[in-house]
């Protein structure tokens, strides 16, 4: 079950953190230039937190820069694993 409001707690990740996608991610139609349903990421892809935002005043959304793929994808905490904290 989804948390009622993640915003009561601090973000799980900070700008500069190195993270890994836990599972493959498909375009839900919000990523421009790539067909809906097409894979954006594979499980294990590594990226860096560029910024932290919110969605619906309930959830943190992390802008992850997947440098090797050349894309910036908004992801939720349950889709990511911390590999290395920012210095």
Summary of predicted features, one role per range:
Residues 2-87:
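Basic/aromatic-rich interaction segments and small domains that mediate binding to polyanionic partners
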């Amino acid at each position: 079950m989804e948390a009622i409001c993640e915003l009561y707690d601090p973000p799980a990740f900070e700008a500069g953190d190195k993270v890994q996608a836990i599972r493959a991610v498909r375009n839900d139609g919000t990523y421009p230039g790539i067909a809906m349903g097409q894979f954006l990421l594979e499980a294990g892809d590594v990226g860096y937190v560029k910024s932290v935002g919110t969605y619906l005043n309930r959830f943190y959304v992390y802008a992850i820069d997947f440098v090797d793929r050349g894309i910036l994808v908004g992801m939720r905490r349950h889709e990511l694993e911390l590999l290395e904290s920012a210095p």
